Regions:
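Globin-like tetrapyrrole-binding proteins
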Residues: 1-139
Length: 139
């Protein structure tokens, strides 16, 4: 049986340069790719503090992993979903698939041991959280 949680965690460490607390180009490359992917994304990030945003994404990925591992919705993810809802930042559902594809492309670039299992692990870890975020859009 394939341990996708372990595959994801090991890949995440590799893209961060070996430590989940280390800073590197992964998040810069992700946001460059994501913002360039759509005029709507660029508009949403026009006045955003990117240093803060990168820290939030780093924490969000840990929340996604937590949700995948425990099958429970972390409180932090509920708060993020509220901030991304129609009533707040108004992040529509279609941007999440774009977000995921940009994230996967960035993993491909930064993980020297990228493989089909690594990509699937990232998709599986993110899937439940994305489903939750899109569900909460109109809540």
């Amino acid at each position: 049986m394939i341990d996708f949680e372990k595959i994801f965690t090991e890949s995440y460490k590799r893209v961060l340069g070996g430590s989940m607390s280390q800073e590197n180009d992964f998040f810069d490359d992700f946001y460059d790719r994501f913002i360039a992917s759509s005029p709507l994304v660029a508009e949403k990030f026009a006045n955003v503090d990117m240093a803060f945003q990168k820290r939030m994404l780093k924490q969000s990925i840990i929340l996604l992993l937590n949700m995948f591992a425990t099958k429970r919705i972390p409180d932090g993810l509920t708060e993020i979903a509220r901030k991304h809802s129609r009533k707040a930042a108004d992040i529509p559902a279609e941007l999440y698939s774009n977000w995921l594809e940009c994230l996967i492309a960035t993993v491909r670039k930064h993980d020297p041991r990228n493989s089909n299992d690594v990509e699937l692990a990232w998709r599986m870890v993110c899937a439940q959280g994305i489903a939750f975020m899109t569900f909460m859009y109109d809540k």
